[in-house]
A protein has these predicted regions:
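Anion-binding (especially nucleotide phosphate/pyrophosphate-binding) glycine-rich loop
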Residues: 1-121, 125
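FAD-binding subdomain of flavoenzyme oxidoreductases
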Residues: 112-114, 123-152
Length: 152
């Protein structure tokens, strides 16, 4: 289902509450996306307007300038996941701590170290988050990516 992206884009959006440090400035344009289709539509909106894009998920380990961030800030949110046997496919916006709880509830091990860790799976994967001698790279089997330049 196509979304009306122009109605969802916010102008002059305060980013302060979106980081764990609770400091920062504002975005020229902002949108919250909750799934892959919304993400692609937001990327394409910025691409058509020739605007830079900044991706933000859980907001941990990031400092945002007090100055205006030019372009579109895309906040990746939502908690989509599916389970097939002992494999769980998870959307990048899913809270890492919540994912640890979900996997434990399913009887899957390996993410116990992530309970209480702030941030999202997308950010954790990008930065190889870890604690207590374990890290996310030991649990991720595959990452699906979108090539902005190719549009695929």
């Amino acid at each position: 289902m196509k979304i009306d992206i122009d109605e969802r884009i916010k102008n002059h959006y305060d980013l302060t509450p979106l980081t764990t440090f609770k400091i920062g400035g504002w975005a020229e344009f902002f949108i919250l996306v909750k799934n892959q289709q919304e993400l692609i539509e937001a990327i394409n909106w910025a691409k058509i307007k020739k605007l830079p894009r900044l991706f933000l998920a859980g907001g941990s380990n990031i400092l945002i300038t007090k100055k205006k961030l030019r372009g579109l800030v895309i906040k990746i949110s939502g908690e989509e996941y599916s389970v097939k046997g002992n494999i769980i496919s998870v959307w990048a916006g899913t809270s890492l701590s919540k994912l640890a709880g979900i996997t434990a509830g399913l009887g899957l091990s390996g993410l116990e170290w992530a309970l209480g860790i702030p941030g999202s799976l997308g950010g954790a994967t990008r930065g190889n988050a870890g604690a207590y001698g374990s890290d996310i790279s030991g649990q991720v089997a595959e990452v699906e990516a979108y090539d902005i330049a190719k549009g695929e």
